[in-house]
Amino acid sequence: MNSTKPRVRFAPSPTGELHIGNARTAFFNWLYARHYGGKLILRIEDTDRQRSTRAFEARLIDDLKWLSLDWDEGPDGKGEVGPYRQSERLDLYESFLKNLQKDGRVYPCYCTEDELELERTSLLSRKMAPRYMGKCRNLTEADRRRLEAQGRRPTWRFRVSQGPVLFQDLIRGTMKFQGEAVGDFIIVRSNGTPAYNFAVVIDDHFMEISTVIRGEDHLSNTAIQLMLYEALGFEPPEFAHHSLILGKDRTKLSKRHGSVSVREFREKGILPEALLNYLALLGSSIGEGREVCSLEEIITAFSLDRAGKSGAVFDEDKLLWMNSLYIHEEPAIKLIERLRPFIEKAGYDVNKWETPWLDRMVEAVKPNLTTLADIGSYVKMIVEEPVRIDEDAAAVLRETETQMVLRTLLQLIEEGKFSHEDFYSQVMTALRKVTGARGKRLFMPVRAALTGTTRGPELDKIFVLLGEQSVKERLKKALNMQGNFS
């Protein structure tokens, strides 16, 4: 099945939001296809009738599109080896179950969930790995009729042969599993739907998948799938198992570690380019020592040889840092469109503002943004009255010298001796001459009065955004409030 043009697949289950680890798997498959000029197939594994929904499928597809991870074949109508939803391929799975039944490679199992749990508990108490012990492996026809008369509906289990299962992993090298350690596994559930490993083998074969790239938590599944490939007479694809994303406690990343879905990072205001850049470098040597790489550079440099074998710890602080770099480099026109939904979510109607003012506002706050969602607090600081004074700003306003600086500034502005072309520079130069204040003693009182904080956009830009009238009003309010800080 190996070819010069690889066919890889991303096959998520629409049972919840797209996990960041699954997004990384999708990205690796996408990179592999784009690097080698192959094709990426999107397959929806929706045989879990209770948990799979079209709503989750739609959100999953939307997240992939947001990441710009396009596919060449999938449920949207592209491709000739569909359908690309497993729920639409049930007849195919049933036909191959019949083949395995005919060949004696499978048998019906009537064990209940309670019986299986009891067996599992017993094995664990003896410090043995849980596996099916073959209770129903050699039932007679009479046994089966008796159990079915009790209303039991069978699952179908694959007869596992003893002996080693070996395969060459493209990332990890030679891998070896013992068949007897696996136990006879279910390939079809009692409701007639195929189990994961059975459906995957059939789908990968008929979709002509050449390379399966997925997380290391699927290593044991690969051993199971290779048994099925042999039984069905299919040539197996190549396999590559990349490392998992870990939390700071070095356990598999989960909700208890914080944000874990692509949707959550979208809502936090992470840029897709920043997220992909971070995921590409996480636990790999693709960046060759560089922190920031363009998507084109990542495609060119991508190789499974550079994918890490050891689990990689997810560092959200580093992602935020990387995101800030992307925001700061984003052209204002493009950034405004990305900020628009976050401004509106914060409760402001962007359409009420004139375009030149909006452009200036975004340029002013851009160096201070870590995420797109940060824009809300800066808009509030600029457009809402009265401005909220935080504790650090209040401490500045308590200082004796502050009142003198602010009163002098207000007086200078009201005298109206400055041109509007370079208003800020002229008025601050005059303020420095009159008060003798320099550095923080000059600028910090002004910042605290106008913005309510001691950090933020450059003051000259704040002056322009607020306008002369608003600057005067905020100075007056700060002076009137000083009695409350004493």
Curated annotation (Swiss-Prot):
GO CC entries: cytosol
Enzyme Commission number: 6.1.1.17
Location of the motif 'HIGH' region: 12-22
InterPro entries reported in the protein's UniProt record: aa-tRNA-synth_I_cd-bd, aa-tRNA-synth_I_codon-bd_sub2, aa-tRNA-synth_I_CS, aa_tRNA-synth_I_cd-bd_sf, Glu-tRNA-ligase_bac/mito, Glu-tRNA-synth_I_codon-bd_sub1, Glu/Gln-tRNA-synth, Glu/Gln-tRNA-synth_Ib_cat-dom
Enzyme class: ligase
Alphabetized PROSITE patterns for the sequence: AA_TRNA_LIGASE_I
Localization terms from the record: Cytoplasm
ATP-binding found in the keyword field: yes
Keywords: Aminoacyl-tRNA synthetase, ATP-binding, Cytoplasm, Ligase, Nucleotide-binding, Protein biosynthesis
Main location: cytoplasm
UniProt KW Aminoacyl-tRNA synthetase keyword: yes
Signal peptide interval: none
Residue window of motif 'KMSKS' region: 252-256
Residue numbers binding ATP: K255
Recorded catalytic activity of this chain's protein: tRNA(Glu) + L-glutamate + ATP = L-glutamyl-tRNA(Glu) + AMP + diphosphate
Pfam families on file: Anticodon_2 (PF19269), tRNA-synt_1c (PF00749)
MF annotations from Gene Ontology: ATP binding; glutamate-tRNA ligase activity; tRNA binding; zinc ion binding
GO biological process, one term: glutamyl-tRNA aminoacylation
Entries under PANTHER family matching the protein: GLUTAMATE--TRNA LIGASE (PTHR43311), GLUTAMATE--TRNA LIGASE, MITOCHONDRIAL-RELATED (PTHR43311:SF2)
Subunit comment: Monomer.
General function of this protein: Catalyzes the attachment of glutamate to tRNA(Glu) in a two-step reaction: glutamate is first activated by ATP to form Glu-AMP and then transferred to the acceptor end of tRNA(Glu).
Family note: Belongs to the class-I aminoacyl-tRNA synthetase family. Glutamate--tRNA ligase type 1 subfamily.
Name listed for the protein in its UniProt record: Glutamate--tRNA ligase 2
Gene that produces this protein: gltX2
